[in-house]
Amino acid sequence: MATAKVLLDTHALIWWAIDDRALSRKVRRLIEDATTIVVVSAASAWEISTKVRLGRLSWPTTRPIEAYCAEQRFEVLSMTFAHAERAGKWPHAHGDPFDRMLAAQSEIERIPLATNDEKIDAFGIETIW
């Protein structure tokens, strides 16, 4: 049996961090399963940091996001030129740069994206919720 691998959308990461019931049972079980490789994009750190700076979000810990991810044993996925180029080339109008980056990473790295954002469906990537 192959090991499951999942890329967390930013809201999934936040909901996991604050133990929010909005996180689906399926995604919660995947994260809790020690055999699942849970991946967090640097784009999520960028998005969270931006929203904290703008006062739109409160990150639940004083630890840096990367340190939190390490404590959770999440893998960190850096953004590459290939990711950036793919994120910029999609023809549809979904304008959120963070979602575009996460979708590009999901497609290129062949990792399903854990998201409940229906707008992501326009990218044609594999999602889990």
Regions found by a protein language model. Name each.
Residues M1-V40, L54-A67, E109, E118, ...:
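Short, well-structured N-terminal submotif of metal-dependent ribonuclease cores
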Residues A12, S44-A45, H83, L102, ...:
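Alpha-helix capping/helix-boundary segments
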Residues D19-D20, K51, W90, E126:
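Residue-level signal for well-ordered alpha-helical positions
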Residues V40-S41, M79:
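Short glycine/serine/threonine-enriched helix-capping/active-site loop
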Residues I48:
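Phosphate/NTP-binding elements of NTP-utilizing enzymes
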Residues R56-T62, E66, A70-N116, I128:
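Active-site neighborhoods of divalent-metal-dependent phosphate/nucleic-acid chemistry enzymes
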Residues F123-W129:
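Acidic, glycine-centered active-site loop in nucleotide-sugar glycosyltransferases
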